[in-house]
Design a protein with these regions (language model features):
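Conserved phosphate- and dinucleotide-binding cores of soluble alpha/beta proteins
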Residues: 1-118
């Protein structure tokens, strides 16, 4: 899952570990350091149960595998969010735009409630 600030949880669902982190951090770090390098996190917009993979906040207990400052792009079937160099509000807008349409209003409400977006 991805939080509206851009941080990524890739190894757990809440407190339940479902995989290792693999090389995600190394890939993101290497891409950021490479001249002209770009990194992408590709996810479906929803879980198999129909829940949004883009969330206002990561689920309680979720581990941050990739911090927000390392994430450059997030891709869903609805487009690409360009996060590098963006403010928290801009990041939230970009991520909401690629969230499943059924969750965009709720994500916008949560972002405004938390002061991420005005």
């Amino acid at each position: 899952e991805v939080g509206l600030a851009g941080q990524v949880c890739a190894d757990s669902v809440g407190m339940r570990i479902i995989s290792g982190v693999g090389g995600q951090h190394d890939f993101m770090y290497g891409g950021a350091l490479s001249e002209g390098g770009k990194t992408f996190i590709a996810i479906p917009s929803t879980t198999p149960k129909g829940e949004s993979k883009i969330r206002a906040l990561l689920s309680p207990g979720a581990g941050v595998v990739t911090t927000r400052h390392m994430v450059q792009h997030v891709v869903t079937e609805y487009g690409v969010a360009h996060l590098r160099g963006r403010s928290l509000g801009e990041r939230a807008r970009q991520l909401i735009a690629i969230a499943h349409p059924d969750f965009r209003d709720e994500l916008t409400f949560e972002a405004k409630k938390r002061g991420i977006m005005i």
